[in-house]
């Protein structure tokens, strides 16, 4: 059983990138559906305000810390995690393991045409990977999309609708897709399609992808301002715990 670490009300699997990918492969050999969630600080805060969303995340089979802020908060709370596991890197590690195994991947989300472009790029990057279908994120009814995924006989679905929409969609429709593993991956399809560039490696290693994105998109300042509040919440919980023990 994988060790879990509670951070501000949400339990994370304390895993490395490789451990997370191996765990996902193991889940694919069990009857599904299994939800993989990739919360960052913004998503944790959202889960604290929305009990229903919080329950869906808590029920996920694999919860990985996508966001350096989650790792910092864990240290503040005295419950250190093994490290950050970016969702985009988790997806890459999972696809590398799927390639050649005959496991089938469906891509759901983004603007029309983006998922198809991502599929073409991934087929080149991961020889042997079977992308069995795509669907954009602009749809009104869930059932036809779930049926499309079922007909494609997908083993894994990357659901890229943004949080909390993607996790709630998986909770409602996961069983109807017939897939074993469904992963909430936010804006990953835009990256796989080459529409959005990841931060340079130096920024990634330093955990400063958020700063790079802020420089590229100043309009994100409102969202980024939530990170200090998240860390303050962690510090407040640590102080409160200290008072209870004193």
Regions found by a protein language model. Give the residues of each.
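Short glycine-rich anion-binding loops that position phosphate/pyrophosphate groups of nucleotides
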Residues: 40-43, 161-166, 188-189
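Conserved beta-alpha
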Residues: 71-148, 152
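N-terminal nucleotide/polyanion-binding subdomain common to many enzyme families
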Residues: 1-83, 88
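Conserved acidic residues
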Residues: 61, 132, 155, 180
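Short, flexible loop segments at boundaries between secondary-structure elements
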Residues: 136-140, 180-216
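Proline-aspartate-enriched helix->loop->beta-strand connector
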Residues: 149, 153-163, 179
